[in-house]
């Protein structure tokens, strides 16, 4: 029997709101409050222990009883003998472990039982024929509960790449799974945002090409384009607008304790309104105000609606009652800075996975070699010097002169073969114009020989 967990919202307008979980152990908060990246942490989202997992008090895990744990452990022992299903069996013989199949089948209860029993380094890093781990498959399909539980899995390398060079973050960003991207950024230690695939593309570039929404100035070594240029090239106008908004506002000021919920343009607008009230409007202004149709203006950047959203989502907002606290109030999220994950801020980060070191003296080779893209203009550099465009001030080299001379006729001339006599083979007829052409050629050759 699958347990329906009950989750309490951590923030609301003046009170506590209960949200329905829909059978999913991971709850995405929607509405006026959105938990900011890394900086706000729910008190209950700490490293869970075995007791809270069994009692169902943790937000990311379902309620498990002792009988259910024993039942799932028996299912895990039997899973090794199950036949491999169709497309989910990349390797012959089906030697993939139970951890991989729990991720593929989107079974968080079975995955939690596996994590409680302990995971070996071989099981955590096991891949299929495409080079993908269970975390990559879950990120590709959008299994949010599985990705949340795998954040507590030891020996798991979040930056592991498949045969195409894609990481778990690339697969989630390219597929447009925003909650999974947020989980990877906030709860996975050592996540490399600038890891590149075989084509030299980062996760941000792949998300921009897919119109989804790092370093915005990073370019791929093949085409030399940034994420904004890739978004423009692939007609991802929504992503272009988001990137430009992020460049205009590189820092989230309202998530700092030093933010004051005051509108800077308020004093200037009040003074302007008072000055206009003292001056009587002219006849033209009255006529224009009478004849003009009242259209609702769209929200402007830095206007009153923009300030309202910023003030209500700040940490010192008097309108929203929050039950969470920020871990780094002096360092709000900003563009160009790598924020720490929640386990790093809490000091509960697991040790990094062991990387096999090459023996000393052996050269370190990169797994992929990127070939730079050569524009059509670069072909001119390989041409001759006189073919390249030059300005009027530089000396222009002389164009070489090419003289063509016809080879003299050799003394040995091919004699026509005599036609065989008989009625079996007939000679081609020789017309009058052909005879005149032959005579003219003979005369020209005789005149040329006489001149020599």
From Swiss-Prot:
InterPro entries: Ankyrin_rpt (IPR002110), Ankyrin_rpt-contain_sf (IPR036770). Residues 349-362 have a biased composition (Pro residues). It is found in: Cytoplasm, Cytosol; Nucleus. This is Photoreceptor ankyrin repeat protein. Residues 406-424 have a biased composition (Polar residues). It comes from Homo sapiens. Residues 335-369, 405-427 are annotated as: Disordered. The keyword Cytoplasm applies. GO terms for cellular component: cytosol; nucleus. GO terms for biological process: skeletal muscle cell differentiation. Acts as a transcriptional repressor for CRX-activated photoreceptor gene regulation. Gene3D superfamilies: Ankyrin repeat-containing domain (1.25.40.20). Keywords: ANK repeat, Cytoplasm, Nucleus, Repeat. PANTHER family: ANKYRIN REPEAT CONTAINING, PHOTORECEPTOR ANKYRIN REPEAT PROTEIN. Its main location: cytoplasm.
